[in-house]
Amino acid sequence: MSNEEIARIVSEVLKRLDKDEGVSAAVADRPAAPTPASSCGGPIQPTVDAAVRTAVRAQAAFQDLGLEVRREVIRAMRKAAIANVERLAKMAVEETGMGRWQDKVQKNLVCATRTPGVEDLISKAYTGDKGLTLVEYAPYGVVAAITPSTNPAATIINNAISIVAAGNSVVFAPHPASFRTCVEAMRLLCEAAVAAGAPSGLITTYEEPSHDNTRNLLAHPDTRVNMVTGGPAIVKVAMTVGKTCKTIAAGPGNPPVVVDETANFPQCAQDVIFGASFDNNILCTAEKEVIVTAAARDRFLDAMRQDPRAFELNAAQTEQLVKLVIKVGGRGCKDPILNRDYVGKDASVLAKGIGLSIPGEARLLWVEVPNDHALVWTEQLMPFLPVTVARDVDAAIDLAFQAEGGHRHTAAMHSTHVGNLTKMARKMQCSIFVKNAPTLYGLGLGEGYATMSIGTPTGDGLTKASHFARPLHCALVGYFRIA
C-alpha cells in the first residue's frame, strides 16, 4: 500500500464518519464538561494506585454524562485514530523492530473503523401477563487491560473503543517493548475523548512498565475487569492473582490451514501467502502451517512457486533456520521458546541469518516438510511457513486438529466441497474459522467486526463493547403490559 493510497483511504473514511455521524442536537446543546477540552492531562500516572484512582473518578463522571455524549466520545476517538494510523504504524515498527508498517496501517485502520461502539449495547424488554422486565447494559467501572508488543497501537485503539463504549474507564499496562507507541496512542485517544466532552483520566497508564506493576494492576481491588492480550505467562498471572473479578484472557494459537483438491488454484496459495506474510506473521490468527491433501499437493506447490512473494527453502536451509529461530519447540511442547531476535522480522532478515539473499519482493519463506516437523507444531510468529501433505481430507483435518493444540483459536480451509468445510469447522470448534480466504478476513477485513483481543481460553471469543458491560434486570410487575 503506497503513501498516496493510505492518504486517500484515511480521507475517505474521515469524510464518511463526518457524514454518517453528525453531532446530535442533544449533545450540541449540552453544557461543556468541566474538564478543559484542550488536554487530557496526559495518560501517564506515577503509580498503579494513582492510575486506578484517576480512572475511578473519571468513570463515575463519564457514566453520568449519558449515552449521547458517549457516542460522540467514541466518534472522536475513531477520528483521532484514523488520522494517525500511519504515524502509529511507523512508531510501532521503529520501537519494537517487528512487523511491516504498511500492514500495521491496515490493522490500525480496521480497528478504528470496525470495532463496535455504543450500538453493541442492545437493551431488551420482556413483557407478559405479569408485567415487564427491562434489561440494560451497565459498565463495570475500571478495566485493567494488558497489551502486547506485537500489535501495540491496534490493540490500544480496539480495546479503548470497546471499553469506553461500554461506559468504563481503562488502565492500560503496555508491554515494555512497545510502551512509547502505546502511550502515544493513548494520548491521542484521551485528548479526542476530552475534546468531545469526556472527563480526563478515562484512558490512563502508569510509569515503569514491569512484571510487578502488571501484577499489582491485575490484583488491584478497584479494577472490575481484567483484560489480557498476551502470551501464556501473563495469562497465567491474570488467572491466578487471587481476586474475584471478570477476566478475559487471550491465549496462544497455532492456526492450521487445510487445502483440499477442490480448492480454487492458484487463489488458495495467493491467500495463504498474503495471510502468512501479513505484518510478518505476528498476528495470533495468521496462517502458521498448511496441510494439503495428496491429491492437491502438486497444484498447490506449483502455485506457491509461481508467486514472487514466496521463496522456497531447501531441506538444509530449513534445518539451519529452524535451529536459529526456535530454541524450544516441536510436537508435544506446551511452552515453545522462540529466538526473539527473529520474531516479526522480514523474510529477508530471516534469510540473512543463514547467509541467504532473497529477492526484494519475497515476503515469505516456505518449505515442504514431513508431518512431524517442529515447524508444524510450533507457533513461530514469523514469515516462515511449513507445508505438509496428508493422505486425504480426513487425515488433513485430523492433523490440523492436533497441530492446533486444542487452543480452539483460529483455523482455515480452502475447499469448494461444502461437506469438507462443514466437517473441519465442526471438528476444530475455533473462535475463528475462515473458508477460502486469508484468516485476516475473520478479524474485521471481511464481514463482521474487528478485535485485537480474542478471549478463547475464557470463552469470550472476539471481544467487543458488550463484553465490558454487565446486564441489569429491572422488573415491574402488574403494569406496562399494553397488548
Residue ranges, per PLM feature:
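Structural signal for hydrophobic packing residues in well-ordered secondary-structure cores
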Residues: L14-E21, V56-Q59, Q63, M77-V85, ...
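ALDH superfamily catalytic-core signature
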Residues: I157, V235-L364, P370-N371
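Terminal low-complexity tails and localization/encapsulation signals of metabolic enzymes
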Residues: S2-C40, T127, G131-P139, A347, ...
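Rossmann-like NAD(P) dinucleotide-binding subdomain of oxidoreductase/dehydrogenase enzymes
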Residues: S123-Q267
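Flexible, glycine/charged-enriched surface loops at secondary-structure junctions
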Residues: D64-V69, G197-L202, N280-C284, A310-V322, ...
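Conserved C-terminal structural/oligomerization subdomain of aldehyde/semialdehyde dehydrogenase
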Residues: L356-A483
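N-terminal Rossmann-like NAD(P)+-binding subdomain of aldehyde/semialdehyde dehydrogenases
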Residues: N3-L134, S162, Q306
